[in-house]
Amino acid sequence: SAEFIYENIMIQTNLINEAYLNGVKKFVFLGSVCIYPKFAPTPVKEDSLMTDHLEPTNDAYAVAKISGIKMLQAYHKQYGFKSTCLMPSNIYGPNDNFHPENGHVIPSMITKFNNQTEEVTFWGDGSPMREFIHTDDFADACIFSVDKSSDNGELYNVGSGENVSIKD
């Protein structure tokens, strides 16, 4: 919706601008792999950005995140503002959404197995491929990126590096 895009763009615009105005040494922008085209080959590479159509169910969120990436790259070019952009794969860990019907993949599977009586039912045929990363590993990647990544708003995918099917 228009409100969703507006609010997300305004939030990140204000954060980025205030970080720049207040002398933040390096800004770490967190996005999502939903910024990539719907049919991007997996594992998705950073250079797939804006090469095809987005997934329609996520396009408002993706557009907002892409605008943040582009804004940081422009701030670096114009002002020398240092930033990096991290796109996590499917994050899982404590305090996630464990609801069996609308939770994230791994937490909802845990709930279903825990509550199982005879049979566990999943969505679809289990063939979709996903890459996962634990919250602790993603936090480590964020800290690592402050010192070790480029400063020009470059985009980095963060995940396990291995796609697995849901049924596996």
Residues of each region from the PLM?
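Flexible, glycine-rich beta-alpha linker
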Residues: I35-P37, D59-A60, T84-P107, P128-M129
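Active-site beta-alpha turn of Rossmann-fold NAD(P)-dependent dehydrogenases/reductases
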Residues: V28-S32, M87-S89, G126, G159
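Hydrophobic positions on the long internal alpha-helix
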Residues: I11, L15-A19, M71-L72, A141, ...
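Active-site Tyr-X1-5-Lys
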Residues: N17, E55-S89, S108-T117
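Short-chain dehydrogenase/reductase
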Residues: I5-I9, H53, T57-I69, H99-P107, ...
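Glycine/proline-rich active-site loop of Rossmann-fold NAD(P)-dependent oxidoreductases
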Residues: A40, I66, I91-P107, N115-E118, ...
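Conserved Rossmann-fold NAD(P)-dependent oxidoreductase catalytic core, especially the SDR/UDP-sugar
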Residues: Y6, M10-D59, T84
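Active-site loop of short-chain dehydrogenase/reductase
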Residues: G23-F27, G80-K82, T117-E119, D125, ...
